[in-house]
Amino acid sequence: MPIHHSVFNHPFETKQQEIDWIDGLPFSPSYDDRFFQADAIKEIKDVFIVPNNLEDRFKKSQKISIGELGFGFGLNFFVTAMIWNQSKRHSSSAVLNYLSIEEALPSKEEISKVLENFPELQKIGEYFLSHYLPVHNDMQRIELPGLNIRLTLIQNNAELALQNLLGFSNNLIDAWYLDGFDPAKNLAMWSSSVTQLVALLSSNQATFGTFTSAGLVKRNFTKFGYAVSKVKGFGKKRHKLIGKILPRKHIQNPLSVECSKIAIIGSGIAGSCTAYAAANHGLQVDVYEYGQEAACGTSSNPVAAMYPRFSSNNSSYAHLIAQSYFFADRLYSNFQNEYKRTGLLFSHFNKYQEDWLQQMIGLDRKDIFQQFTEAEMKKEFNLESKGLKVLQGGYLFPQALCQALLRHEKIKVYIDHCFENTYKNNLKISLNFSNQLNSKQYDAVVIASGAGLLNVIPSLKISKGQLVGLKDSPDITCSIPINSEGYILPPIDGITWIGSTHQKDFQDLLPSSEATKDLILRTERNFKINLGSADGALTEARVRLGSKDRLPIAGKISNDQHIYAIGALGSRGFSLAPLMGELIASQ
């Protein structure tokens, strides 16, 4: 996994601006400067919109990417969104990609207070706030379908955030907003290294606008390949800088530029999330399923839950788990029949779990965690333990959710197709199936076939997991998923499902009566409850796939073709799949 650079000690560390309010406008005592003036909308148009020629580019382009250093209170974004939506010639399929970096994000209340000064931005601002949930730092992707905008908001310092974006040609920016405080007071953002990173992440058509006319900024951008001009500034400011990238050779990403139709092998949670993300990126998607209906394999369990076992360190893995969990929660919340946003409960802690509990409590994030005393747990959940509730997340109906994700106008599902391999067909990719003829050609193929990934990545680990469904369990009355050494899911149609086993050596996927008894006994011991007899218990057994380092697979697996894989999601499949699918769709 690539090294992840962050200014924060863990994903849940927060940082906000120090603000004084003067006449309803924010002032920074740290930089001894206003964030913006009362005529901010006019200044934004003059400093960023016009120099980047955005009104004309919006009308001519189906896809454009804007990069911003300094999100502030979102005013640049709101004005851009307003102009983007006033551009009547862009079609409903046109998408604005807006990437913004800010080390200290504002609260919802602060943004609302700022918007009171700009009634023309109120509607767009309120729509944004309905999607704005900065529960973790670093990167979050915010889909704003009502505006045809895809916002990537990164809470990090500028240099580290830009470093993390290197290596992906889909991250190239067409127009830059450079909006930090005065270079004399904010040297870190205007450093030579930041300027070089901006240049490296610039497309061949890139331009920039900024309020400053500092010689340092002009020299740095000139050094790294921009033609820079000093022109009249806004209002009382004498000058400002604008720039355009000079001609150069730049490797573009063929998939992101030319891809229009892809095939996905597998319709489980990995395949359906990837298909949904790709369709939302404007691609035509064909999904091939070996069974007689979508999501009839591992993702056909009757009920499942997300798994918020967060980490309080600064590792790449910790950031991945936090980002993927909350991204999944936002996505699933659009499917209220298939996803129940109840939160999740942890209880009955062993020594290892007690250490984890104290780490989470130490984060002091009451917007994410709620503590329960033993008395409160007894009263609320009838459990003999203290508890910790994760307020976001919940449980879901896997097959129904997958099928809902696949009900997209740009997605077609083909059942009863047993995939064998891919082969080159001129500049396209075609597919072989053992039981079907298929002459279609694709720009890219994504293999999301669960255990079928072993055919292309044989080093993956496979195990068997078993669930047990119990009828009439009076000791279990909880309407929220409960986690300890194992888990208990809310009753569905009078059946309470518990899980799960991890069997590395197995010969088939038939449920085991011995595993059923062991799972019931383990659950009774862990949760201090009586589940009764195993007679009449329902059982489900599925394959679980993981990697040796426990990291998911999501990316390109062929050097000369656009063939991708997603899988090995382990026990976190429903938490990881949406973000991993978005990652592949963005390439």
Description of each model-found segment:
Residues 103, 280-300:
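Glycine-rich FAD pyrophosphate-binding loop
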Residues 414-430:
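A conserved short coil-to-beta-strand element within the FAD-binding core of flavoproteins
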Residues 122-125, 312-313, 337-346, 371-406, ...:
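Helix-loop-beta segment of a Rossmann-like dinucleotide-binding subdomain
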Residues 438, 442-521, 526-537:
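Flavin-dependent oxidoreductases
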Residues 534-587:
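C-terminal catalytic lobe of FAD-dependent flavoproteins
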Residues 303-380:
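Dinucleotide-binding Rossmann-like beta1-alpha1 core, especially the glycine-rich loop
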Residues 57-171:
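The AdoMet/dcAdoMet-binding core of the Class I SAM-like
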Residues 259-287:
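N-terminal Rossmann-like FAD-binding beta1-loop-alpha1 element of flavoenzymes
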